[in-house]
Design a protein with these regions (language model features):
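Tandem repeat scaffolds
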Residues: 4-10, 20-198
Length: 198
């Protein structure tokens, strides 16, 4: 498997450098982070990850630009200065993870779960999030300019110094459950966040 992975990453590197003219885009399925070297973890830009798992690791200055994730799992992961610009994250679960100075600009996040996560000094500028659940999460110094949040569930979550909340494009919070939704309007959602800010 190690040899096959090396060939896949070499081909992906060639694909990136040639802007798609040569090589092949990296597509990994059911790979765990302990199967990858630190160098390979830094080479996931513009890749496709399906049912991959990342556990008990620190990702620093990794670039997930334009990366697609499907049904992945991140458990006890520390994200530091990581780029998620224009990434697409689907049906992925993040548990007990920290996001510090992470850039989610123009990312699209669908049907994801964030459990006991902390976001600090990060940006959700022009980020779209649909049908996601944030349970026991903390948001510190997060920039929400032009953010678009549709039907997100915030359970036992708190905000500290939210930035540019008034410049968000649309925020609709579900204060009910998936089975029994209770949707707030944009204005009500902003008030809810402010009321739950420290």
């Amino acid at each position: 498997m190690t040899g096959n992975l090396e060939k896949l990453f070499d081909s992906h590197s060639e694909w990136i450098q040639s802007e798609g003219e040569d090589g092949e885009q990296l597509s990994l399925e059911r790979i765990s982070s302990d199967q990858l070297t630190n160098e390979q973890l830094q080479m996931l830009t513009d890749s496709v990850l399906t049912e991959c798992s990342f556990t008990n690791i620190e990702l620093r200055e990794n670039d997930f630009y334009h990366t697609e994730m499907y049904s992945c799992k991140f458990n006890n992961v520390s994200f530091g200065e990581v780029q998620f610009i224009k990434s697409e994250v689907n049906d992925t679960k993040f548990t007990d993870s920290n996001f510090e100075t992470v850039n989610f600009n123009n990312a699209e996040i669908f049907d994801c779960i964030f459990l006991e996560c902390t976001f600090s000094d990060s940006t959700f500028i022009s980020t779209g999030i649909w049908n996601a659940m944030f349970d026991d999460c903390t948001f510190v110094n997060i920039d929400f300019e032009s953010a678009y949040f549709e039907k997100i569930i915030l359970h036992n979550s708190k905000f500290i110094n939210p930035i540019n909340l008034d410049k968000a494009t649309k925020i609709v919070i579900n204060i009910g459950t998936v089975e029994n939704p209770l949707l707030l309007t944009h204005e009500e959602s902003l008030k809810w966040i402010i009321d739950n800010s420290i």
